[in-house]
């Protein structure tokens, strides 16, 4: 019995050792291997600040006027190339038990045109590239298969785009839907079937496709609006546009704050919309390319009527109107004679009250006195703007044309 007891004691010792080793080994393992992984409570509990940070959409940063100027482009030099025509094929008909088949090479497809198309949703030439290549036509095939012609490539341009070539105006795209073929596609080549004749029953001649037309065009944008606000720098044109429309041009107390034209829409009853353009400030000698120069004077050409904005707080404000009309007349004959209204701004300033009576005496016409900052007398401007538009619309309908709609 002694050996049996000794064996059982040793066996018990071995089992105890194995048990201690198993417990120590399991304890040393990572919890992730033993238990299913659970999300950390920190990931599930989000504070109010963190929740707002994740839920709120990132707001769009307001661009300064200098940065906006990069997005508004009113001039582009464009190289347009029409698509090349496809080559004709030279092959013969092949059929069992027919040794001498006739020619069956098809013609190549024509190259695609490059066309300028006016799109009302486009407001600038910034999306126009400096080079365009039309789609080429496919080559002809056997069994009289003609190649597919290249698709037409459309270039979207804004309303009021002027197309020039070699200093000469070749197209004036002033209406929505207007199109102009900027470059013609090349003609497709002829297959050998085209050269089949009585004295040549097995022609092998085929011609390559013609290259597309290449042209260098200069695109100029002239902003199309019903009314154009004209004035000297810091006269309050941008503030006035912000007051009567939803446009948000930059406003500051220094001259030449506005570096590009802005167009605001004034809404009236009956879904009538009048477009008002804020033209950058004009100085004396602007027609000689001083200041911002004549680069922005051309935007006034398409305006149907004008609003001369005068800074009433400046000494002798009537001279501003005379100088503005002179600059417009020097730039283009008859531009200053368009229907217009005189808007005297900054009536809220003390020095403006003293100049009001003198301004009316010198001009001898109705003057709309208001303050774009405080909103004083803006209703009179809106009513007069409607009168100018009605006169313009009546004149257009009398000549059989539809008024410009935005």
Swiss-Prot record:
Tell me the domain of life: Eukaryota
Classify the main location. mitochondrion
**Which residues does the annotation say bind GTP?**
231-238, 256-260, 278-281, 345-348, 371-373
- The Obg domain extends over 70-224
What are the residue boundaries of the OBG-type G domain, all occurrences included? 225-390
Q: Name one GO molecular function term.
A: GTPase activity
Q: Where in the cell is it found?
A: Mitochondrion; Mitochondrion inner membrane
SUPFAM superfamilies reported for this sequence? Obg GTP-binding protein N-terminal domain, P-loop containing nucleoside triphosphate hydrolases
Annotated residues for binding of Mg(2+): 238, 258
Summarize subunit and interaction data from the UniProt record for this chain: Associates with the mitochondrial ribosome large subunit; the association occurs in a GTP-dependent manner.
Q: Which HAMAP family match?
A: GTPase_Obg
Return the protein name. Answer: Mitochondrial ribosome-associated GTPase 2
Specify the species: Homo sapiens
Source taxonomy lineage? Eukaryota, Metazoa, Chordata, Craniata, Vertebrata
Gene from which this protein is expressed: MTG2
């Amino acid at each position: 019995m002694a050996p049996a007891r000794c064996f059982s004691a040793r066996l018990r010792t071995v089992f105890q050792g194995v048990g201690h080793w198993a417990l120590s080994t399991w304890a040393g393992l990572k919890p992730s291997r033993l238990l299913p992984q659970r999300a950390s409570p920190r990931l599930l509990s989000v504070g109010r600040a963190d929740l707002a940070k994740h839920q709120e959409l990132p707001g769009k940063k307001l661009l300064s006027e200098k940065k906006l100027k990069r997005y508004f482009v009113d001039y582009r030099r464009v190289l347009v190339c029409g698509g090349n025509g496809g080559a004709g094929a030279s092959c013969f008909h092949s059929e069992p038990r027919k040794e001498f088949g006739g020619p069956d090479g098809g013609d190549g497809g024509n190259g695609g045109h490059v066309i300028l198309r006016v799109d009302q949703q486009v407001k600038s030439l910034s999306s126009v590239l400096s080079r365009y290549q039309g789609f080429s036509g496919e080559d002809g095939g056997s069994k009289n298969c003609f190649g597919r012609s290249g698709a037409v490539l459309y270039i979207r341009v804004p309303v009021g785009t002027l197309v020039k070539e070699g200093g000469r105006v070749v197209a004036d795209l002033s209406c929505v839907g207007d199109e102009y073929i900027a470059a013609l596609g090349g003609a497709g080549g002829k297959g050998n079937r085209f050269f089949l004749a009585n004295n040549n029953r097995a022609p092998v001649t085929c011609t390559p496709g013609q290259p597309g037309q290449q042209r260098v065009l200069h695109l100029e944008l002239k902003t199309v609006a019903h009314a154009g606000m004209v004035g000297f720098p810091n006269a309050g044109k941008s503030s006035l546009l912000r007051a009567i429309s939803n446009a948000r041009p930059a406003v500051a107390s220094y001259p030449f704050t506005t570096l590009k034209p802005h167009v605001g829409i004034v809404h009236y009853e009956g879904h009538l919309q009048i477009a008002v353009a804020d033209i950058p400030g004009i100085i004396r000698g602007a027609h000689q390319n001083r200041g911002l120069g004549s680069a922005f004077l051309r935007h006034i050409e398409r305006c149907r009527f004008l609003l001369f904005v005068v800074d009433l707080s400046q000494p002798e404000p009537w001279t501003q109107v005379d100088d503005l009309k002179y600059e417009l007349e020097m730039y283009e004959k008859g531009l200053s004679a368009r229907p217009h209204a005189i808007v005297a701004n900054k009536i809220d300033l003390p020095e403006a009250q003293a100049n009001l009576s003198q301004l009316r005496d010198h001009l001898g016409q109705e003057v709309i006195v208001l303050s774009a900052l405080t909103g004083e007398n803006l209703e009179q401007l809106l009513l007069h703007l409607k009168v100018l538009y009605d006169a313009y619309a009546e004149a257009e309908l009398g000549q059989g044309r539809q008024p410009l709609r935005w």
